[in-house]
């Protein structure tokens, strides 16, 4: 009887590791499928942002340069109104959810509304003033500023390879700018301000999303809502509102279609930016924007109508483009390695706990 008891006890002890091994294998499969879904969502969010960012630059350029619409402020105002209207209707239909307004909302959003307003208006103004190739190459300064912002706000560090590719992009931008025959000082100043605001906005959006107080829809809604009246007041006192009302192109159906698309794309781009930042990072969002800018650079050379070719400018543009491609590859590779090491360390910890 004692022998039988010992055998049963030994059998039970032998089964425990097998059960533990099976359980661990199931956990590994579950984590692998979750990892695949996460990567897919990240790529989808990045692709959505890239397409949205491309379309809004092309449409805004057409409205402000080709049709010579006189007010960047009023285009920005239209984008804010469209954002608020779409999200308000979405909330009423229970398609989206975000917190109702209370006295703590301004504190929870600050300083994003100011950054959003500045980012939007400087972006529109520089789009109007600069040809598309120079607009896109100067936008690469936003990567440098994003690195600073994430370093200060999110305490991130960057590898030597990342720093060198950013340096190459900036050198390329300086070379291209040195022989820009269509040089416009106001355009250059506004695009550099826009780069700083883009970097700060991306880092703060990531910080606010991590706190989970308002969510992505709440941030979008209140950013636009808080800046409608200030933008309207600025447009009125600067005379931009009157210029927009006096514009002769309102009777043109094609212009109306593009203006409406510009307003709606403003909301879509805001949503895509927050979505990409949420699933990836502020830096990844900036990278996707730069890859999109490569396409816009070459399209702008051929179809933009305001690009003046010089070899020095062309070489500078391509140095910056090459730097952005290598930069994107290094950043993506580093991010994947980081995720894999985190996943393996979690598995090791769980494996030790199961033994």
UniProtKB/Swiss-Prot annotation:
Keyword Kinase included in the entry's annotation: no
**Purpose:** Nucleotide sugar antiporter transporting UDP-N-acetylglucosamine (UDP-GlcNAc) and UDP-glucose (UDP-Glc) from the cytosol into the lumen of the Golgi in exchange of UMP. By supplying UDP-N-acetylglucosamine, a donor substrate to heparan sulfate synthases, probably takes part in the synthesis of these glycoconjugates.
Q: Name one GO cellular component term.
A: Golgi apparatus
| GO biological process terms, semicolon-separated | embryonic skeletal system development; heparan sulfate proteoglycan biosynthetic process; nucleotide-sugar transmembrane transport
- Please give the name of this protein: Nucleotide sugar transporter SLC35D2
> Is-annotated flag, keyword Transmembrane?
yes
Q: Which residues lie on this side of the membrane: Cytoplasmic?
A: 1-38, 90-156, 206-216, 275-280, 336-355
- Provide the residue span(s) of the region labelled Disordered: 1-27
Tell me the InterPro entries matching this sequence: Sugar_P_trans_dom, TPT_transporter
Q: Looking at the record's lineage, which domain of life comes first? A: Eukaryota
Family classification: Belongs to the TPT transporter family. SLC35D subfamily.
Which subcellular locations apply to this protein? Golgi apparatus membrane
Topology of the protein relative to the lipid bilayer: Multi-pass membrane protein
Span-the-membrane segments of this chain are 39-59, 69-89, 157-177, 185-205, 217-237, 254-274, 281-303, 315-335
Q: Which UniProt keywords apply?
A: Antiport, Golgi apparatus, Membrane, Sugar transport, Transmembrane, Transmembrane helix, Transport
Provide the catalytic activity annotation: UMP(out) + UDP-N-acetyl-alpha-D-glucosamine(in) = UMP(in) + UDP-N-acetyl-alpha-D-glucosamine(out); UMP(out) + UDP-alpha-D-glucose(in) = UMP(in) + UDP-alpha-D-glucose(out)
Its Gene Ontology molecular function terms? Answer: antiporter activity; nucleotide-sugar transmembrane transporter activity; UDP-glucuronate transmembrane transporter activity; UDP-N-acetylgalactosamine transmembrane transporter activity; UDP-N-acetylglucosamine transmembrane transporter activity
Q: Which organism is it from?
A: Bos taurus
